[in-house]
A protein has these predicted regions:
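Functional transmembrane helices that form membrane-embedded active or gating regions
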Residues: 131-135, 201, 205-232
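Transmembrane alpha-helical segments and their boundary/interface "anchor" motifs
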Residues: 35-44, 53-109, 126-133
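Juxtamembrane/transmembrane-helix boundary motifs at the membrane-water interface
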Residues: 10-40, 75-100, 144-149, 212-216, ...
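Short, small-residue-biased leader/transition segments that mark boundaries at the very start
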Residues: 2-9
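Structural signal for the C-terminal ends of transmembrane alpha-helices
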Residues: 51-57, 111-123, 165-175, 202-210, ...
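Interfacial loop-to-helix transition and helix-capping segments at the boundaries
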Residues: 30-40, 86-107, 146-175, 180-198, ...
C-alpha cells in the first residue's frame, strides 16, 4: 500500500531479467504475508482494548491516550499510505478521506463507554428491562459503526463490531473466539482464512493476565514509527 514503491520494485526486478509473471507471483505472496499479519493483529488489538477498558483504573486517561496517538499517527499514516502531504493536495493537516486504525480503536472505546452508561440507566432485572437494555446497546453499536464508516476509519464498522462483541462476551474465551469467527463472516461475507483462524485460536488461549505495563507505550509508538520507516525504505527504490 505504500504508493509508488511497488512500481519501483517491479522495475528493478524486471530489469534484472525476472518475468512479469514471476514478479507478480512473488509480490502477491509478500502482500498476503503482510496482510495476514495485519489480519491477525487487528482482532487482538480489539480484544486487548476491551480488556483494558474493563480493567483500567483511569478510563478518561485511557481514552485520551488513544485519541492522542490517533492524532500523532495520522501524519505518518497519510504520508506513508498516500505519499502526499500539502495544502495544495488537500492533505494538510490531515487527509480526511481515510483515517488510521487508532481512530477506530478510539471510537471503539467511546462505544463501550456509552454501552455502560445505557446499562446503568436502564435498571431492573425484569425481562422487559433486559430486552430494552440489549436493544439500546445494540443501537449504540450500530450508530457508532455508522460513524466509523462516515469518518472513514481503517477497518470501519468492522472494528466497532469486534470491540463491542469481545466486550459483551468477555466472560468466555470460547464465546469470544466463536463470536469473532461469526462476526468476521457476517461483516466480510468471506470464509475464515488461515490467518483469521490463528487469530481466533489466540483469543481462545488468552489467559486474561496483564502483561508488562512498562512496555505498553512501545506498542503505541510502534504503529506510527513503523509506517514512517516503511515509507522511508520505499523512497530508497525511487
Amino acid at each position: 500500500r505504500l504508493v509508488g514503491s511497488e512500481m519501483c520494485i517491479r522495475d528493478r526486478y524486471l530489469a534484472g531479467g525476472m518475468s512479469t509473471e514471476q514478479f507478480y507471483g512473488i509480490d502477491a505472496f509478500q502482500k498476503n504475508i503482510l496482510n495476514g499479519i495485519g489480519t491477525i493483529a487487528f482482532p487482538l488489538f480489539c480484544l486487548l482494548l476491551s480488556e483494558g477498558f474493563f480493567y483500567t483504573k483511569n478510563r478518561k486517561r485511557y481514552i485520551g491516550g488513544m485519541l492522542a496517538f490517533a492524532l500523532i499517527s495520522e501524519v505518518p499514516f497519510d504520508i506513508g499510505f498516500f505519499s502526499r502531504y500539502s495544502i495544495a493536495e488537500g492533505t494538510f493537516p490531515f487527509y480526511l478521506q481515510y483515517q488510521n486504525v487508532f481512530f477506530t480503536l478510539f471510537l471503539g472505546l467511546l462505544t463501550l463507554v456509552i454501552i455502560e452508561k445505557v446499562a446503568l440507566k436502564i435498571s431492573g432485572d425484569g425481562r422487559k428491562s433486559k430486552v430494552t437494555k440489549i436493544l439500546c446497546q445494540l443501537g449504540v453499536v450500530i450508530i457508532m459503526a455508522i460513524i466509523a464508516e462516515l469518518v472513514k476509519c481503517d477497518y470501519g464498522s468492522q472494528g466497532i463490531v469486534y470491540v463491542s462483541m469481545l466486550y459483551f462476551l468477555r466472560k468466555s474465551r470460547l464465546l469470544q473466539s466463536a463470536g469473532f469467527l461469526i462476526m468476521y463472516m457476517v461483516t466480510t461475507g468471506n470464509q475464515p482464512t488461515i490467518f483469521i483462524v490463528v487469530a481466533a485460536l489466540i483469543i481462545l488461549l488468552y489467559n486474561g493476565k496483564r502483561g508488562n505495563l512498562s512496555i505498553k507505550y512501545f506498542f503505541y509508538w510502534f504503529y506510527p514509527v513503523h509506517i514512517s520507516l516503511l515509507y522511508g525504505a520505499s523512497l530508497l527504490f525511487k
